[in-house]
């Protein structure tokens, strides 16, 4: 299966997306992208230690604090913070990690792949959703 087909399959199967680095500021890209995904039926779990809630959902300080199954970890953090997030996703056995545009960390991506996790890197989940699931 091609990468675009795999992306479409992951987006079709996913129900719950944990968004690491989700901002409570509606002007930030993470907020707009996440609001779009929520409006298309995905359960959103904000992961940001600096907020209590976002988009009507309780926020958690880290992935390890999330009490439910996560289908996709969507990362809106600078690359230097990605490896810790990936390590937590591996620990939780999350099936997919999505690093947004300009979030590139080859070492962390390879570590996730070695753990059997599907990885998308340097792509916007909103743009891919629009392109693949019309």
What are these regions (language model features)?
Residues 89-112:
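ADP-ribose/adenylate-binding Rossmann-like module
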Residues 128-134:
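A charged, well-structured terminal subsegment
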Residues 67, 106-127:
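Short acidic, glycine/proline-enriched helix-loop-strand junctions
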Residues 17-20:
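Conserved beta-strand elements of the Class I
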Residues 1-3, 53-68, 72-84:
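Glycine-rich, highly charged phosphate/nucleotide-binding loops
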Residues 23-28, 34-55:
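NAD(P)-binding Rossmann-fold cofactor-contacting core
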Residues 1-13:
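Short N-terminal or domain-adjacent regulatory/targeting segments
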